[in-house]
Curated annotation (Swiss-Prot):
Involved in protein precursor import into chloroplasts. May be part of an intermediate translocation complex acting as a protein-conducting channel at the inner envelope. It is found in: Plastid, Chloroplast. GO terms for biological process: protein transport. Its main location: plastid. Part of the Tic complex. This is Putative protein TIC 214 C-terminal part. It comes from the Eukaryota. Keywords: Chloroplast, Plastid, Protein transport, Transport. The keyword Signal does not apply. It comes from Marchantia polymorpha (Common liverwort). Belongs to the TIC214 family. One of its GO terms (cellular component) is chloroplast. The keyword Chloroplast applies.
């Protein structure tokens, strides 16, 4: 199909002549005289899209070339452009094919880039998680060096063939349960178990790890004194209470479904009660005539098909169980006694005084004394326990019995030797860099936003 521009069409029309006059010339001569031709021609040209913004008053024989400039120019074919400007034609053709090749190649490049980005991100995540896991193992082994068996058992599990057929969606931290007494364990199901938990000092180290979904079947180990069993006990108790409630006596009551029904039945009941007390026949006849008007009610409400449930609602309720006065008094007094006993138990510090006095001052063994004075226990404890420890320590210092300390004994036992200084400086809780690393791995923070959560001392105070 050959494309022809509007200018080309008008030029051809202009060249057509009949009696040495073109159609357009004849039309333009009679343009002003015949207005109806002007309007029809203008509407036709506007519908065809030939005339838009141009005014037809300027459409004359003299300036027809200027009028033709307002139309779209003729688009030559590629062969004609090759004859006119061969170099420009070649450049445009090469640009056209280059753009098409780039469009085809770009999606593949983007896909490959995205795949590479995904793979690199997963590898980085795995490296980070492994690094975090190693750091946690090291820190836990420092604090709980006596229970190395749990860590060894966990490390040896990878040698088994259980993990070959398991697919896990995400990289997850596994838990390990270590308990020497197998009596206290109950197997919830007979499927394979991949649920581990560290049995570490939770009083010293908080647990921030959450459980995540896994695709494989699990065997859950439940202790006898666990929360799950307590919940089961509560359910059984609730079932027993529900059975006791069902045994209590109940009062049955029927309630009308609507107030209009209730009013109509009251009318009928009142009329029937009056009929029993009346003796005169005239009054009975007058009442019966009134009741005939309401006989439709009897037909509606007392049919064979109608039942009581269609007209009324059962609103029965059980009687409450009577409580003795002694039970109420016991419950009221027991709460008060429990609160009083709890306050007394918290305020009683005799046991703590004895324990701290023995460990800090009265015990003259070298190892125990060195353990409590060479390391700062506040750095290991949690914030809540740290406050308690400080309060108890301040209370014990007021005791005269425990403050009697022989300074000469301390000077003899603890001299400023190089070995002790090196040991205390190398210990992780006193090094600024190690604490920063522990903060990053435990609280998952790269910057120092939560660095205040860990209290540290750059250099510990040495005994003089």
């Amino acid at each position: 199909m050959i494309l022809i521009s509007q200018a080309y069409v008008f030029n051809k029309i202009w060249e057509i002549k009949t009696k040495n006059k073109s159609y357009l010339k004849c039309l333009l001569k009679y343009w002003t005289s015949h207005l109806w031709i002007k309007k029809n021609f203008q509407s036709f040209l506007s519908n065809q899209g030939i005339v838009g913004s141009l005014e037809l008053q300027n459409f004359k024989e003299e300036n027809w070339k200027e009028w033709l400039k307002g139309f779209n120019r003729y688009n030559f074919s590629s062969k004609e452009w090759y004859k006119i400007t061969p170099q420009q034609w070649r450049n445009k053709v090469s640009e056209h094919w280059k753009n098409q090749e780039n469009k085809k190649l770009n999606p593949n490049q983007q896909i490959s880039k995205n795949n590479f980005f995904i793979n690199t991100s997963i590898l980085e995540q795995t490296k980070k998680r492994n690094k975090i896991f190693k750091q946690n193992l090291l820190t836990y082994s420092c604090f709980d060096f006596t229970k190395n068996l749990a860590i060894r058992n966990f490390l040896n599990l990878n040698r088994k063939k259980i993990y070959n057929n398991i697919i896990i969606n995400k990289i997850q931290k596994s838990y390990f349960i270590y308990n020497k007494k197998a009596k206290y364990l109950d197997f919830f199901s007979q499927k394979q178990n991949i649920f581990f938990e560290y049995n570490l000092l939770l009083w010293l180290i908080p647990e921030f790890i959450e459980e995540k979904n896994q695709y494989q079947n699990k065997r859950i180990l439940i202790l006898k004194n666990s929360i799950i069993k307590e919940n089961n006990k509560k359910i059984i108790q609730n079932q027993k209470l529900f059975r006791k409630r069902e045994l209590n006596q109940s009062i049955r009551q029927w309630r009308w479904k609507s107030k209009s029904l209730e009013k109509k039945f009251k009318k009928l009941g009142n009329m029937a009660s009056l009929m029993t007390f009346m003796q005169n026949q005239e009054n009975i006849i007058s009442l019966s005539s009134k009741m005939r008007e309401d006989l439709k009610l009897f037909h509606l409400f007392f049919r064979r098909n109608t039942t009581i449930n269609q007209l009324t609602i059962n609103s029965e309720h059980r009687l409450a169980r009577l409580l003795d006065d002694q039970i109420l008094m016991y419950k009221m007094v027991s709460t008060f006694l429990n609160i009083k006993y709890r306050f007394k138990r918290l305020s009683n510090l005799d046991n703590f005084d004895d324990f701290l006095g023995i460990q800090f001052f009265e015990n003259k063994e070298k190892n125990n004394f060195f353990f409590f004075n060479s390391f700062n226990l506040e750095d290991i404890l949690l914030p809540k326990r740290r406050r308690k420890f400080r309060i108890l320590n301040s209370l014990t210092s007021k005791n005269k019995k425990n403050t009697q300390l022989n300074q000469k004994f301390v000077q003899k036992k603890f001299s400023k030797t190089k070995i002790k200084k090196i040991k205390r400086f190398i210990w992780a809780s006193y090094r600024f860099e190690d604490l920063a690393c522990m903060n990053r791995f435990w609280f998952n923070t790269i910057n120092g936003s939560r660095f205040s959560m860990l209290r540290f001392r750059m250099y510990p105070s040495l005994l003089t």
